[in-house]
Curated annotation (Swiss-Prot):
InterPro entries: DapB_C (IPR022663), DapB_N (IPR000846), DapB_N_CS (IPR022664), DHDPR_bac (IPR023940), NAD(P)-bd_dom_sf (IPR036291)
Keywords on record: Amino-acid biosynthesis, Cytoplasm, Diaminopimelate biosynthesis, Lysine biosynthesis, NAD, NADP, Oxidoreductase
Organism: Halalkalibacterium halodurans (strain ATCC BAA-125 / DSM 18197 / FERM 7344 / JCM 9153 / C-125) (Bacillus halodurans)
GO biological process per UniProt: diaminopimelate biosynthetic process; lysine biosynthetic process via diaminopimelate
Main enzyme class: oxidoreductase
Active site: H153 (proton donor/acceptor), K157 (proton donor)
Record's protein name: 4-hydroxy-tetrahydrodipicolinate reductase
Encoding gene, per UniProt annotation: dapB
Binding-site residues for NADP(+), renumbered to this chain: K36
EC number: 1.17.1.8
Record-linked SUPFAM superfamilies: Glyceraldehyde-3-phosphate dehydrogenase-like, C-terminal domain (SSF55347), NAD(P)-binding Rossmann-fold domains (SSF51735)
Length: 264
């Protein structure tokens, strides 16, 4: 059994993760970290499963009080990096679903993981379908280099563009030379109308109630277009990827950024 703690158990993703871990035959929920409800049990929190795992309001105290193999962090970009550093310092393997990590952050965290000889995973998106979308988009960009990305999320999402959109753009840029798209003399009547620029690609962010997580990668060529789209209808769609990450992180000794690097 892999012993797992969850940071951020009352968020929408956190609730699904706690439920999945509690029900999984190969995983054991041993604790959760929440800024409120210190000293309570998971089963005493609204909407969470009937688990006797304790609630801690501080990650460090949680890690020193329990035997934990993996920390699943589903908090915020501000907390994700700090929680990852604390977990690595305690020899606990972090699986982090928040975004906002810079290249320098990833380099430093990878160095720390390798010094400790343990695995770590940062996943901008846990939906396996979204990972396949990114892989398909990278392949398409070899032949259709004119591309724009449109990502759509619920209106409570704090960062824009999404980590998935940025990761998609990065993967495309590995096979596509930077090029300016659109008319060379085009103007914006409203600032930002053409989206954010990434090596000539435009990334557009939509935030509306009723959405969960959606992305289109739109390619254009002579006399044709190609659209690659993924939709997460609910947060259960992310749980197979969370479980895969927990199982995978136990067998690696470096930091992996992006589920596409652990899916064959």
């Amino acid at each position: 059994m892999i012993k797992v703690a969850v940071a951020g158990p009352r968020g929408k993703m956190g609730r699904e993760a706690v439920k999945m871990i509690h029900e999984a035959d190969t995983l054991e929920l041993v604790a959760v970290v929440d800024s409120k409800h210190d000293g309570m049990l998971v089963r005493q929190l609204d909407g969470l499963p009937p688990s006797d795992a304790p609630v801690y309001n501080e990650l460090e105290r949680c890690l020193t009080s329990q035997t934990i193999d993996v920390l699943v962090d589903l908090t915020t970009p501000a907390h994700g990096k700090r929680h990852m550093e604390i977990a690595l310092d305690h020899g606990v393997r972090p699986v982090v679903g928040t975004t906002g990590f810079t290249d320098e952050d990833i380099t430093n965290l990878r160095k720390k993981a390798e010094e400790k000889g343990i695995g770590a995973i940062i996943a901008p998106n846990f939906a396996i379908g979204a990972i396949l979308m990114m892989k398909f988009a990278q392949t398409a960009a070899k032949y259709l280099p004119d591309v724009e990305i449109i990502e759509m999320h619920h209106d409570r999402k704090l960062d824009a563009p999404s980590g998935t959109a940025l990761k998609t753009a990065q993967l495309i840029s590995e096979v596509r030379k930077a090029k300016q798209q659109g008319h060379p003399d085009e103007t914006e009547e409203l600032k930002g109308a053409r989206g954010a620029d990434f090596e000539g690609m435009s990334i557009h962010s939509v935030r509306l109630p009723g959405l969960v997580a959606h992305q289109e990668v739109l390619f254009g060529g002579v006399g044709q277009t190609l659209k690659i789209r993924h939709d997460s209808m609910n947060r259960e769609s992310f749980m197979p990827g969370v479980k895969l990450s927990i199982e995978t992180v136990m067998g690696i000794d470096t930091l992996v950024y992006g589920l596409e690097n652990i899916i064959e």
